[in-house]
Amino acid sequence: MTQIATENPSTKSVSNKTDRKKGLSIFILLLLIIGIACALYWFFFLKDFEETEDAYVGGNQVMVSSQVAGNVAKINADNMDKVHAGDILVELDDTNAKLSFEQAKSNLANAVRQVEQLGFTVQQLQSAVHANEISLAQAQGNLARRVQLEKMGAIDKESFQHAKEAVELAKANLNASKNQLAANQALLRNVPLREQPQIQNAINSLKQAWLNLQRTKIRSPIDGYVARRNVQVGQAVSVGGALMAVVSNEQMWLEANFKETQLTNMRIGQPVKIHFDLYGKNKEFDGVINGIEMGTGNAFSLLPSQNATGNWIKVVQRVPVRIKLDPQQFTETPLRIGLSATAKVRISDSSGAMLREKTEPKTLFSTDTLKYDESAVENLIESIIQQNSH
């Protein structure tokens, strides 16, 4: 019995060592399996992708401003309202604009009459020149006869002197009338009535007054939704002052900020999978890299950091990457500027360019609402000219 009792501790020690070795082997095996699984997961699912959650929706916020000063009379749209290009958003009091327009019409009528009067003045001066030419010819004829009589001693010297003075006076009158005629002809320059400088100035003033009257109605430059309205009825607005913004849901993009270490294989044209926090992980959207900014976000900030100090700490910088979105995907799931998103870029194909290539000049955005049909004012101008000319 004593011998059996002395053998049990040794057996238990060997058994414990064996169990520990087995446990350690199992643990190491599990670590290897986890490591291999992670490596395989990285190779098949992560190697060809770069992902960031630092991504936000950007878009064009078209600021609506006034081109003329005035007081707000009407506001026709509020925040979140759908508007179309050309819709009247704000109306200014047009009393002063109408008065200026009426004054400009009167000024054009007066300018036409003055030019017409100038034409009659030229005709009168032409007649005066002709009359003075006749007077000079008569005076010269009288002087020639008196020269012959003076040689014969038939007239006195005083009559002869008067004849000479009459010729000089006729010459002076003729020169004066010619100068007056030339001065008035210089004002007309033998050009059509409408092209006269005085009338052109009056026409331009009338068009400007008409344009200012049209601009008292402030229109939406694009299709979109009203945002950031800060104008109030009765408010005095100045030229260029922001009244509200119009945001187009077709002019949006994603601004994704990637770490500089993630840009090594990132190229323009690479596909992007996007999840917006608004619609959750189950709703996936497509995008394409449209460009990579020429500087980090910190470099373009209002107060960029200064690293020329003794307490420098290296911080990984982030570079904005613009991702083009497909507007057709957002007809039923619209976006809002500033929404958060997660962007995952497939970088397996890195044959594209990192910088945009030079392209032919083109118009990216435009509006026709700032142009006005001038046919009405042109007809008005022609009517005023015809009514005040012979």
From Swiss-Prot:
Keywords: Antibiotic resistance, Cell inner membrane, Cell membrane, Coiled coil, Membrane, Transmembrane, Transmembrane helix, Transport. Residues 160-190 form a coiled coil. It is found in: Cell inner membrane. Residues 1-25 are cytoplasmic. It is a single-pass membrane protein. GO terms for biological process: bile acid and bile salt transport; response to antibiotic; xenobiotic detoxification by transmembrane export across the plasma membrane. Residues 47-390 are periplasmic. GO terms for cellular component: plasma membrane. Its main location: membrane. Gene3D superfamilies: 2.40.30.170, 2.40.50.100. GO terms for molecular function: bile acid transmembrane transporter activity; xenobiotic transmembrane transporter activity. The chain crosses the membrane at residues 26-46. Belongs to the membrane fusion protein (MFP) (TC 8.A.1) family. Confers resistance to antibiotics. PANTHER family: MEMBRANE FUSION SUBUNIT OF EMRAB-TOLC MULTIDRUG EFFLUX PUMP, MULTIDRUG EXPORT PROTEIN EMRA-RELATED. This is Multidrug export protein EmrA. It comes from Haemophilus influenzae (strain ATCC 51907 / DSM 11121 / KW20 / Rd). The lineage of its organism: Bacteria, Pseudomonadati, Pseudomonadota, Gammaproteobacteria, Pasteurellales. The gene is emrA.
